[in-house]
C-alpha cells in the first residue's frame, strides 16, 4: 500500500494560504480580479477564473465578498477611491497652471482606470455612480473655493458655473481615455501625443478665457 504525500511545493502553498490574513486575502482577490478585467474586460469577472488565478478556492471569494455582486461593488469602490486620490492630487497645488492641472486630470483616467470604471458600471449600474458623483462634488467644492479666493473684489462666481466646468473637464478626460485615439483618427487626425497635447492646450485656453470673462 502506497501513501501519497504532498510535495514540498504543495505544502508550502498550503502553509502560505493558512498564514494569509483576511486583509491579504481580500487584496489578493481584488488584485487578481482587476488584472483579469484589464485583460478580458467584464468577462473576466467569473469567480471560478478569479479563484484559479489567485490560487484560492471559490468559496473563499464568497466568504470575503458574499457574492459576485459584492466583489464588483468592492472593485468599484477601489477604482473610485483610486480616481479620487488622483484627482485630489491633480488639484493639490493652487499655483499650477491650467495646462498642468488638465494634464494631471487627463492622466488620472489613463492606465486603464477609465476602462475599469466603464466596465464595472456595465455589470453593476448602481455600484459606483454615487461614489463617482461624490468625487466630482468634492473636486467642485475645492475648485469653487479657489475661484472665489482668486476673484477680484465684488466678483460673483456662480456655483453652477464651477459645476459645469468640472463636468466638461471630467467628461472630456473620461472620453479621451476611452476613445480619444479612435476619435482622433475618425476626424483625420494622427493619434499621437502631440494631438493630445494640442487638444489639452486648446481646452485650457477655452477654460482660461471663460474664467476671465466670469471673474471680470
Predicted segments, located by residue:
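C-terminal peripheral helix-coil segments that are non-catalytic and often amphipathic
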Residues: 1-13, 141-153, 175-216
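Solvent-exposed, amphipathic alpha-helical segments
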Residues: 32-39, 86, 90, 116, ...
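Helix-turn-helix
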Residues: 25-28, 32, 36-70, 74
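Short Lys/Arg-rich basic patches
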Residues: 15-19
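Amphipathic alpha-helical packing segments from all-alpha helical-bundle domains
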Residues: 84-88, 125-154, 160-167
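Hydrophobic/aromatic residues within well-ordered alpha-helical segments
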Residues: 68, 75, 79, 83, ...
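Hydrophobic alpha-helical connector segments
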Residues: 74, 85-118, 162-166
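Amphipathic alpha-helical segments used for helix-helix packing
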Residues: 107-140, 180-185
Amino acid at each position: 500500500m502506497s501513501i501519497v504525500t504532498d510535495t514540498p511545493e504543495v505544502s508550502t502553498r498550503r502553509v502560505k494560504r493558512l498564514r494569509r490574513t483576511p486583509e491579504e486575502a481580500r487584496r489578493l482577490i481584488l488584485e487578481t480580479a482587476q488584472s483579469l478585467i484589464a485583460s478580458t474586460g467584464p468577462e473576466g469577472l467569473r469567480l471560478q477564473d478569479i479563484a484559479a488565478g489567485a490560487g484560492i478556492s471559490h468559496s473563499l471569494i464568497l466568504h470575503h465578498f458574499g457574492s459576485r455582486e459584492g466583489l464588483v461593488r468592492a472593485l468599484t469602490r477601489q477604482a473610485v477611491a483610486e480616481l479620487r486620490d488622483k484627482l485630489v492630487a491633480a488639484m493639490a497645488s493652487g499655483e499650477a497652471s491650467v495646462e498642468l492641472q488638465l494634464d494631471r486630470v487627463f492622466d488620472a483616467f489613463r492606465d486603464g482606470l477609465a476602462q475599469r470604471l466603464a466596465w464595472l458600471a456595465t455589470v453593476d449600474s448602481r455600484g459606483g455612480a454615487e461614489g463617482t458623483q461624490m468625487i466630482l462634488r468634492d473636486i467642485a467644492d475645492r475648485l469653487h473655493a479657489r475661484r472665489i479666493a482668486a476673484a477680484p473684489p465684488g466678483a460673483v462666481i456662480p456655483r453652477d458655473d464651477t459645476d459645469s466646468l468640472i463636468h466638461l473637464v471630467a467628461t472630456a478626460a473620461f472620453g479621451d481615455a476611452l476613445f480619444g485615439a479612435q476619435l482622433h483618427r475618425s476626424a483625420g487626425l494622427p493619434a499621437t501625443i502631440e494631438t493630445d497635447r494640442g487638444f489639452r492646450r486648446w481646452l485650457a485656453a477655452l477654460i482660461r478665457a471663460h474664467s476671465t470673462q466670469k471673474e471680470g
